Amino acid sequence: MPKMKTHSGAKKRFKLTGTGKLKRQQANRRHYLEHKSSRLTRRLAGDKLVFKGDAKVIKKMLGV
């Protein structure tokens, strides 16, 4: 059986923490920030953890 390939899109979007959880960036903070409030852009600043159910699928894509 051949090796599983890592999903390139998932590889770019998610990072694995030391404890095995997955980190992701929030959407809506790339461009067109002029019309978005400062409050919103600050709120979207930090990374978030991926929910358990989603993490299972993403880990499979990453080959973890």
From Swiss-Prot:
One of its GO terms (biological process) is translation. Signal peptide: none annotated. Keywords: Ribonucleoprotein, Ribosomal protein. The keyword Mitochondrion does not apply. GO terms for cellular component: cytosolic large ribosomal subunit. Transmembrane segments: none annotated. Residues 1-31 are annotated as: Disordered. Disulfide bonds: none annotated. GO terms for molecular function: structural constituent of ribosome. Belongs to the bacterial ribosomal protein bL35 family. This is Large ribosomal subunit protein bL35. The lineage of its organism: Bacteria, Bacillati, Actinomycetota, Actinomycetes, Micrococcales. The gene is rpmI.
